[in-house]
Amino acid sequence: MNKPNEITLSPHWEDRISNEQKLRRNDQRSVFQRDRARILHSAAFRRLQAKTQVHGPGSANDFYRTRLTHSLEVSQIGTGVVAQLKLRQPEFRALLTSTSLMESICLAHDIGHPPFGHGGEIALNYMMRDHGGFEGNGQTLRILSKLEPYTEHFGMNLARRTLLGVLKYPAFLDQVHSTERPQEVSNVRHLKSIDWHPPKGVYRDDADILNWILKPLSDVDKALFSTFRFQQESQHTHRKTRFKSIDCSIMELADDIAYGVHDLEDAIVMGIVTRNQWQESVASKLAECGDEWFEANIETISDKLFSGLQYQRKDGIGSIVNALLTSITIKPTTFNDEPEFESELLRWNAFLSPSMSYALEVLKKFVGQFVIHNSEMQRIEYKGQQIVMEIFDALNSDPERLLPENDKREWREAKESGANAHRVIADYIAGMTDGYAQRLYNQLFVPI
């Protein structure tokens, strides 16, 4: 079945975990408009302006994107996808009701990423290895539902469907972790990032939130939703969940497009990649990707990207984004011989056409090879990794002496209640900007 029957959604997807009695005179906004406002006005969102996307704040070139501008671009692409899907497949309009919902999900999707990008994530995962681990998507859910002080206990108290849209991996970290853990190091400077990339999922500390999000689903849907993509290739390979909601699938495509195309633009402007590298690794493959438009226009696009003229480069970037965005359609999430989801939010996902999915993978691989794994970028990431681990080690040595007052109180409460006190330290560090972490490191370790 490739077309839906009449779509009806449970009103419980607009519920919040805590019933609010807010003093808001004549507030006519929808649930999701209020969610968007809460995210935009949050301190956690503002901090993204000083967190690493690819090129860290303080780079010699100020053209680069930060986590904040990346999130804004993901939001722009995500709402563009929703708009074109409503026109292309009007039978799904009841499922794609709110632009504000997609904006909220896209704006919030990276809010849990720590300072120094993946270096910070690996560092916190290593330091939390015996205390539940650390992972950026799991931290995002934690900030939205518990940490951001919009409410006393429930974070931003967002609607259930918004949280479902942010939930990229609906399983606990210990369920998807490799069966064999890497060997610990005697000196953190010898830590290899490839060994300590975290699995993707939710913390056990936040089981109550995951259970609340999934409450409207049937037991059959809950079981199917948490199935894995593939069997583990080896004892050292993490597993990944297979399914996500339709809103999350749109956000994830928008995120991938922003990463594969807009981060490419940064690299071109900053001289990190050359025309020859592009031609060999990307253009030659896109010329044979199976998409007629790309095959006919890739040479012109390449000329524009490397013309040295900003307006030409922007036009080339826009052409690629548009080609990808307009190749997205809604399809069933399961194959014909598999059981279907009962919930409409899970039964359907957004997918790129096969040829354009291949094209996007080529672009992402290029950015990964020539930008992310560029030796200069890796040195910066390594430095951030060391900063985060040393800060964690110091704070954990004497939390009552070194933590700020609010975090100190939370640490004491966790200790007294038998909860995970190490999570409080990880939460504090994860919320830091790159600059704040650097200054705290200097306070702790640089001689006066």
Swiss-Prot record:
InterPro entries: dGTPase (IPR006261), dGTPase-like (IPR050135), dNTPase_2 (IPR023023), HD/PDEase_dom (IPR003607), HD_domain (IPR006674), PHydrolase_assoc_dom (IPR026875). One of its GO terms (molecular function) is dGTPase activity. Residues 67-260 form the HD domain. The keyword Hydrolase applies. SMART domains: HDc (SM00471). Keywords: Hydrolase. One of its GO terms (biological process) is dGTP catabolic process. Belongs to the dGTPase family. Type 2 subfamily. This is Deoxyguanosinetriphosphate triphosphohydrolase-like protein. The lineage of its organism: Bacteria, Pseudomonadati, Pseudomonadota, Gammaproteobacteria, Vibrionales.
